[in-house]
């Protein structure tokens, strides 16, 4: 790691140099869900409904992977900033081993529970069967996902963003190529339907992990993974989980939110469940540029905090917030202008498209204020203040939106649920500023 690069380069160019490879890779990586949804929608609306209902559990698995990865990233960046290379290597090794363990547990738990979980939201046996088929294959790759994410966060912590971009792009391109072949049986491949979508995604994730391993063997890094670093270290493991657990909960809360909103919307029509599922696919794509900025910002804040550069930490936060606000403004404009075509990518049902246009335009009103909570939460994670970051997410994904959505849905119907989104973002933005400013003064 270049010390002058992290501590002396002007903040805006520094953030962009760290974040742009992540923005590109995450935008392309978001195509995993977009491409799956696009091709699955061509099977049937029942298949699309199944994919929408599986999404919260899929998001939960990703939340564990990314959330614990945030802990790995923050601890490594801090120790490198403090010039403690051996501690950084221990954190990387323990983080990777624990990530693999998390993957094994999630595979064993999630696959058997899927038929029961899907039955909570629909009594359509075809939807339950399709969802179970997809989950059974997709969730079998949980260990691969966990280990890949640990390597991703390790590379980000040491400033190797281009290597991360290469690995993610390789996996995503593999998924895009294989999806139609495995779903529809093109060329030598059998027609697998929704199972083909899951298998294509899994193979893409394996390709990403293989690229990470090859890079690790060929590129010199300021830390190493090894058996000698696996010796028990409860203090360091506690640090990993102290940041990783709140970060995981931050990312898992949307899964609980989606399930709760699905239950509210299903009372009106299954079309609204499909619309919510489509929105979250699109939201992933629209929010990912901001997420890429946050990914680039976290190690910078952690490194400079570890080096005692507190004024530079404040500057990094301010620039990140401004960049996120610009991205969110662009997302709002896209949803207002192209709401119809965006919905039509995933369904040809005129009623669903019409209802979805209204939903997208209403929900997108909250994009710009959401920049405050996104930037504040990411900065707090980079500073190692995972609990404070979780407080922001708790407001955003549970304490405000659920009661507001429940009340408004009783008054205005399903449209009330859409209005709950922007109301929540305004309230959470105010809470985020208070929590962040109070935390950095401590």
Predicted features and spans:
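Short runs within selected transmembrane alpha-helices of multi-pass transporters and secretion channels
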Residues: 69, 73, 138-156, 164-172, ...
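Transmembrane helical elements of multi-pass membrane transporters/channels
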Residues: 17-36, 137, 171, 204-208, ...
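Small-residue-rich hydrophobic transmembrane alpha-helices
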Residues: 48-108, 112, 145-159, 163-164, ...
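Helix-terminus/linker motif at the lipid-water interface of multi-pass membrane proteins
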Residues: 27, 31-49, 118-125, 181-192, ...
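N-terminal transmembrane alpha-helices
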Residues: 6-38, 42-43, 59-71, 75, ...
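Short alpha-helical transmembrane segments in multi-pass integral membrane proteins
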Residues: 1-19, 76-143, 189-245, 301-366, ...
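Hydrophobic transmembrane alpha-helices of multi-pass small-molecule transporters
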Residues: 60-63, 107, 175-180, 209-213, ...
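Residue-level hotspots within the lipid-embedded alpha helices of multi-pass solute transporters
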Residues: 26-30, 63, 103, 107, ...
């Amino acid at each position: 790691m270049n010390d002058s690069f992290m501590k002396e380069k002007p903040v805006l160019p520094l953030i962009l140099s760290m974040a742009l490879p992540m923005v590109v890779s995450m935008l392309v990586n978001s195509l995993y869900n977009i491409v799956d949804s696009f091709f699955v929608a061509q099977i049937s609306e029942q298949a699309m409904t199944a994919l929408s209902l599986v999404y919260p559990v899929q998001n939960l698995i990703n939340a564990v992977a990314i959330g614990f990865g945030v802990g790995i990233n923050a601890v490594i960046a801090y120790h490198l900033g403090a010039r403690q290379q051996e501690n950084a290597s221990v954190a990387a090794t323990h983080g990777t081993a624990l990530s693999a363990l998390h993957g094994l547990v999630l595979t064993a738990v999630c696959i058997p529970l899927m038929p029961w979980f899907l039955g909570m939201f629909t009594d359509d046996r075809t939807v339950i069967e399709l969802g179970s088929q997809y989950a059974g294959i997709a969730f079998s790759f949980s260990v691969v996902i966990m280990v890949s994410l640990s390597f991703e966060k390790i590379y980000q912590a040491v400033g190797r963003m281009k290597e991360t971009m290469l690995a993610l792009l390789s996996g995503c391109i593999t998924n895009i190529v294989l999806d139609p072949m495995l779903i529809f049986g093109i060329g030598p491949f059998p027609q697998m339907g929704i199972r083909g979508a899951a298998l294509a995604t899994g193979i893409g994730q394996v390709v990403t992990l293989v690229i990470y391993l090859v890079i690790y063997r060929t590129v010199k890094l300021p830390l190493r993974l090894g058996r000698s670093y696996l010796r028990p270290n409860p203090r360091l493991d506690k640090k990993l989980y102290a940041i990783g657990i709140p970060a995981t909960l931050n990312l898992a809360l949307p899964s609980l939110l989606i399930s709760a909103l699905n239950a509210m919307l299903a009372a009106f029509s299954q079309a609204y469940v499909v619309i919510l599922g489509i929105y979250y696919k699109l939201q992933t794509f629209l929010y990912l540029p901001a997420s890429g900025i946050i990914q680039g910002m976290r190690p910078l804040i952690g490194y400079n905090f570890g080096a005692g550069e507190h004024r530079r930490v404040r500057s990094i936060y301010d620039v990140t917030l401004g960049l996120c606000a610009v991205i969110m403004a662009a997302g709002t404009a896209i949803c207002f202008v192209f709401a119809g075509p965006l919905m039509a990518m995933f369904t040809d049902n005129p009623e669903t498209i019409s209802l979805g246009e209204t939903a997208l335009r209403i929900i997108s009103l909250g994009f710009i204020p959401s920049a405050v909570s996104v930037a504040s939460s990411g900065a707090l994670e980079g500073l190692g203040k995972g609990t404070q970051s979780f407080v922001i997410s708790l407001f955003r994904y549970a304490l405000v939106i659920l009661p507001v959505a429940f009340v408004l849905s009783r008054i205005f119907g399903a449209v009330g649920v859409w209005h709950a989104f922007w109301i929540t973002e305004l309230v959470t933005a105010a809470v985020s500023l208070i929590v962040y400013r109070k935390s950095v003064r401590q």
